[in-house]
Amino acid sequence: MFSMDSFAMDKDAKLYEGNALFRNQPSYKVFNKSFEHVDDALYTLLNEVEPDVLRMELQETGDLFKSFNRNSALRDPRNNEVPPKPTRDLTTASSLYSFPNPLEQYSELNLKQQAACMRVLLAWQCSQPVDEQDIVVWQATEKKRYNEQQRVQKYIHDHEQGRKEVIYAPMKSLVAVYRKWYELGVKKLQQTYPNDSYMTFSGLPQLPQCRSLNAQTASIEQVELERIVGRVRLLPEVEVRHEALRTLRLRLDRYATRETRAPVQLLREEDKELELEAGNVFVLPLDSLLMLLTTGSYIDLPTEMFLSLRESPNSKHKCMEFQSPFPPRNCGWHTNSLILKLAYGAYISQPGQAKWLDFNINGAVKEVPDEPACDKSSIDLQMVYKPRAIDQQPSDIEDGNCNSALVSWTLRCKGEGDDCNDFQIFSTLSIPAVKDSSGKEPLGCHFIKLENKPDCGCEIMSKYELISAWVQLKLMRAEMGHCTRISLRDFEPMLEEKLTLISLEQQLHDYYNTSMPQLLSNLCEFLKLLDTVPAGDYLLRYSPKYKDKFLLCIVTKEATPQSFQLHQLLTESIPSDQAFLTQSSYLPISPTLCGRLHEELHLLPCAFPAKANGRSVQRRKVVVPIPEPSRQAPVRRQRLKKWSEAQTREFRRRCKVDQKKRARARKTAAANKEKIELEKIMTL
């Protein structure tokens, strides 16, 4: 039996309180919270927001999404642009371009008809035979295609005018690079020419106003390639690699502002004296010739160049020498293409990018060997090491892979009867490439054209580009040139186009109503007027105030209110694209070129997308509003004579005939009105 004392001792004993580590701790319920609770550590970690992402625009309290500012979105560090989509599926081949069709308009042709017409265009584009069945479909749908082309051209014109700033937004980077290139060119001009004051001496009419009173034709004849100096690219087939375009998109500034070596003086003084014994001599570089032929056509073309008139003391004949024009002070289509062409030329000049032929001034041709990675062995301790300065800019590195060619040709102007005038002209230009190792087959021309509306198709070439390509093919005596079309948005290749003299002349006639024989005839009349100007040094200038004239400016010793200084003219304004964006310049879409957009989307050029079920969409008829009849005084009702059955049939027949005539008249009036509106658009 237990005693009472032992029971009391057990009662006073302490109970087990657990491990001392867990004493004075909160209840387990505190740690047993759900992770959806706002005080939970996991909940706080998962819902933490970076301060760079959480901006003032997104900190407002609310359950609905109110607005989104693109400035608040994260940018791609490679190109500093906002990604259009947060994700991209690289497992499937998706198109980068899509035809802008928010109103969901569809073509009058079905899928099979559009496919047949596309096969015809692709066959013509690649100079391949065309299937007879496709030709039948092409001819049967000619009227539908023509009507739809007009509607699509008007639709794309309205689309560009409404979104012009968005479409030409990628042009900002090209404008920034062009400004740096312009500054380098202006520094060279300031070092070459003194800061003299000029004033207007006389005026000369531009080429469109230099028309002969008598009917005459002009042509380029007796073309001879006198000499080539420098390195020319050896290129059997023209192909612009995608890797090069991708590099240029990220490093355009590095390659476009690289300087080139000064061109060699190809036309010797003794050659000029020999030619002056027979008649007048004109020295016209390619850029100067194009300035005379296309001045005032676009806002981003050169407007000034130096002109020197010298009279031979022996023969009394004149040597009229034009210098290269000043760089344009406004940015646009042509300055964008110029920057990209310069950058691409500097990129392929790097070792290992292309093969080159070296042309000596004596006419010798040799292939340039590939430069090794190291000229001498690393064991040679006596080798000369020339470190490059850290602060040396890429523009200070001269590019040696450039060339200059001298071409002599005769501008022959034939009038009525046996009347004929010949002008001996020497032109200098750069050869883009040669096809053979002997250098006897030069490539006529190579353009890099930027497509401003890649979602709509391939644009037609500008008048300046067409005339430039035509002149280069003539002077090089080449059968074919080349035009590489790439997208302005992302520098993706769109089309490799072949250029021929026939196609260039046809485009000039169709799009710009320009005839090259007539333009050359106007050039003959201009050179005749230039022969009457006294000898001396002049500055030939174009001003928008005098749209039909060239201004001949001479140096003046005393400054006057009408005079201007040369250096001030070059530096008074910074090149920008404001004038280009404010003008109504527009390049229509070519209806015959099938580019990357059309091949990926199976879309006919200048056509709306076809219905997915293969059915064509009938165009709605134009509804002409019927004028309300004017109120007239009530006429006293007369008793009508009952007609016979024959008279009733004849009356109904005449009513139907009149109704059809009125319907045809309404359709004709609507078609004429639409045609007039489209002609206004095409003439912009």
Curated annotation (Swiss-Prot):
Region of interest called Disordered, as start-end residue ranges on this chain: 69-91
InterPro entries documented for this protein: ICE2_C
Domain of life: Eukaryota
GO cellular component: super elongation complex; transcription elongation factor complex
Subcellular location: Nucleus
Alphabetical UniProt keywords: Nucleus, Transcription, Transcription regulation
Subunit structure: Component of the little elongation complex (LEC), at least composed of Ell, Eaf, Ice1 and Ice2.
Role, per record: Component of the little elongation complex (LEC), a complex required to regulate small nuclear RNA (snRNA) gene transcription by RNA polymerase II and III.
Family assignment from sequence similarity: Belongs to the ICE2 family.
Name of the protein: Little elongation complex subunit 2
Organism: Drosophila melanogaster
